C-alpha cells in the first residue's frame, strides 16, 4: 500500500522486456480492479543486446498498448529516447535515482497503481521505501509465479495433452484471494474454475473472469444467480435436479450445463450408481438442462492404505459414468482425480482432473512443499525486557524461566493464528531464527520470545513461508494445511507478486 491512496507493485530487482511485459499485465489487472490510474516508474534496461533506439521503441509500444497514464523514466538511455513515448499522456525523465528522489514528483501521485520496475544498479528499493505507506501490518504474500509452476508441475503428469484441468478456487482460493488466482489461471488457459457457492462465482464474473465456473455446492435459492452469470452447478440428487429444471423452464432456458455427481464411496453427496437409469430418464424427459460432465470424489487417494478402496471407486465410477455417457449423443466429460489422484492414479485421469491443494504448493501425498505460494508475515510492534519471575499474557500462562526479551506482533486468532499454537507450542521466524509464542495468543496480538535473537522493533516475523512450511503449523495443530490456509481472515492484506 502506498501513500495518497496509491497501490505499489514493486518489481525492482530485474528489468528486461519479457519481465516488463508480464509486470505491465499485472499493473493493468490491479488498476482495472481498483479503478485507478496506471503509473510506471522504469529505469534503463541494461545488457539486452539491442540498440537503444530499437529497445525503447519496443518499450514505448508495450507501454502504449497497456494504456499507461504516466511514465517516470530514470537513466541516461531512456531519457535520451523521451520522444519515443509521446503516446503516453504524462512523461517525466530523470538522469538517475537520486535526481528522482530529490524532484518532489512523488508528492503529485494520488490514487494510482504504480509499477516500480528497474535494474538492480538503480537501487529502486529507495523509491519503493519513499512511496510506501509506513504502517504496522500483517500481510499474506502470494507468489503467483510459484502457483503457475505448481500448475505446470501437475500438467506435466497428465498422460494425454487433451486432458482438461479444473482448478479449485473455492474458499477465496484456499485463502490466497480468489480474483488474482482466478485471473492468473485464466491467463494460463485452465479449462474450468470451481467454487463452492454461487456468490463466489458471481463475484468472479463481476471482476471480469470469463472462464467456465463450476458451483460445487449450489443452493436452491441461487438458481437465478447461476443463470444470470453462467455458472454451472453440480447436481447430486433428484430434489436439486427437479428444482433446477423447474427454475430453468420458468426462465425459458434450455440446455443449461450441469455436472452430475456420483457417490462411489464418500457418502457425502451424489447419485448412487443404481439411480442412474432413473436419472437418465429424468434428463431425457426435458431440455432445460444438459449434463456437461459426470464425476465423483476419491475418499483416500493420497494414502496407500486406501488403494484397494480407491480402485473400487474407480471401477464403480467407470461403470456408472459409462452408462450415463452411452445414453446421450453428445460428449459427457468424466473426472474423478483430485490432486493426489492425478499423481497416484494416472490411469483414472479420464477426460478431466481437479487440482486443489497442489496448486497452492502442498503435496497431499507426503505434505511436502512443491513451490511455496503463500507467506504470512507481520512486524514487531514492541520489544520489552521482562524479569525471569514474571509471566506474559492473559491468565498468566506465559511462564518465564529467565530474564527475557518479549516482542509483541500484530497477529492473533482473529487473523487466523490458532490459539493452540501459543504457550510455546510453536514458533515464528524472526531474522531466520525461531521465536516461540509466549503465553496465550490474543485476538489481535501475540507475544514471542526473542531473547536470543538480534532484532529490533519494525523487524519482520514470518508465521509461515519458504523457511517455515505451513505444514509445520498444521502438524503442530494436528490438522491439514487446507484448514490453516483457509483460516486466514479477510482483514489480513493479500499482496501479490511474480518471482
Task: Explain the meaning of each model-derived region.
Residues 1-66, 148-166:
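Nucleotide phosphate-binding/pyrophosphate-handling subdomain across enzymes
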Amino acid at each position: 500500500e502506498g501513500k495518497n491512496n496509491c497501490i505499489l507493485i514493486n518489481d525492482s530487482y530485474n528489468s528486461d522486456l519479457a519481465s516488463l511485459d508480464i509486470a505491465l499485465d499485472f499493473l493493468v489487472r490491479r488498476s482495472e480492479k481498483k479503478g485507478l490510474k496506471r503509473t510506471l516508474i522504469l529505469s534503463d534496461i541494461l545488457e539486452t543486446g539491442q540498440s537503444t533506439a530499437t529497445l525503447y521503441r519496443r518499450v514505448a509500444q508495450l507501454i502504449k498498448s497497456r494504456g499507461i497514464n504516466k511514465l517516470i523514466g530514470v537513466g541516461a538511455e531512456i531519457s535520451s529516447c523521451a520522444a519515443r513515448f509521446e503516446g503516453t499522456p504524462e512523461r517525466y525523465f530523470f538522469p538517475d535515482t537520486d535526481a528522482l528522489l530529490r524532484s518532489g514528483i512523488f508528492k503529485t501521485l494520488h490514487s494510482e497503481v504504480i509499477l516500480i520496475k528497474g535494474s538492480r544498479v538503480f537501487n529502486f528499493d529507495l523509491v519503493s521505501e519513499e512511496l510506501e505507506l509506513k504502517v504496522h501490518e500483517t500481510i499474506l504474500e502470494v507468489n503467483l509465479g510459484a502457483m503457475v509452476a505448481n500448475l505446470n508441475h501437475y500438467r506435466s503428469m497428465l498422460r494425454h495433452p487433451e486432458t482438461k484441468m479444473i482448478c479449485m478456487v473455492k474458499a477465496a482460493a484456499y485463502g490466497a484471494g480468489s480474483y488474482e488466482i482466478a485471473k492468473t489461471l485464466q491467463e494460463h488457459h485452465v479449462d474450468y474454475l470451481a467454487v463452492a457457492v454461487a456468490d463466489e462465482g458471481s463475484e468472479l464474473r463481476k471482476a471480469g473472469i470469463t472462464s467456465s465456473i463450476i458451483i460445487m455446492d449450489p443452493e436452491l435459492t441461487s438458481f437465478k444467480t447461476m443463470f444470470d452469470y453462467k455458472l454451472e452447478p453440480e447436481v447430486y440428487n433428484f430434489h436439486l435436479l427437479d428444482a433446477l429444471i423447474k427454475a430453468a423452464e420458468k426462465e425459458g432456458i434450455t440446455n443449461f450445463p450441469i455436472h452430475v455427481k456420483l457417490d462411489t464411496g464418500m457418502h457425502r453427496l451424489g447419485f448412487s450408481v443404481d439411480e442412474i437409469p432413473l436419472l437418465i430418464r429424468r434428463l431425457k424427459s426435458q431440455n432445460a438442462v444438459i449434463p456437461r460432465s459426470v464425476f465423483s470424489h476419491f475418499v483416500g487417494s493420497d494414502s496407500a492404505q486406501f488403494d484397494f478402496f480407491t480402485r473400487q471407486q474407480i471401477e464403480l465410477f467407470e461403470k456408472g459414468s459409462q452408462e450415463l455417457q452411452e445414453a446421450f449423443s453428445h460428449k459427457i466429460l468424466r473426472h474423478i482425480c483430485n490432486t493426489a489422484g492425478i499423481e497416484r492414479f494416472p490411469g483414472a485421469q479420464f477426460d478431466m482432473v481437479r487440482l486443489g491443494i497442489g496448486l497452492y504448493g502442498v503435496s497431499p501425498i507426503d505434505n511436502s512443499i512443491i513451490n511455496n505460494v503463500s507467506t504470512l508475515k507481520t512486524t514487531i510492534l514492541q520489544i520489552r525486557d521482562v524479569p525471569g519471575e514474571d509471566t506474559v499474557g492473559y491468565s498468566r500462562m506465559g511462564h518465564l524461566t529467565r530474564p527475557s526479551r518479549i516482542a509483541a506482533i500484530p497477529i492473533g486468532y482473529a487473523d487466523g493464528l490458532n490459539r493452540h499454537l501459543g504457550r510455546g507450542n510453536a514458533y515464528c521466524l524472526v531474522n531466520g531464527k525461531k521465536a516461540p509464542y509466549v503465553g496465550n495468543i490474543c485476538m489481535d496480538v501475540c507475544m514471542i520470545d526473542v531473547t536470543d535473537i538480534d532484532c529490533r522493533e519494525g523487524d519482520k516475523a514470518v508465521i509461515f513461508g519458504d523457511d517455515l512450511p505451513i505444514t509445520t503449523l498444521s502438524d503442530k495443530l494436528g490438522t491439514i494445511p487446507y484448514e490453516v490456509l483457509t483460516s486466514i481472515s479477510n482483514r489480513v492484506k493479500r499482496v501479490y507478486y511474480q518471482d
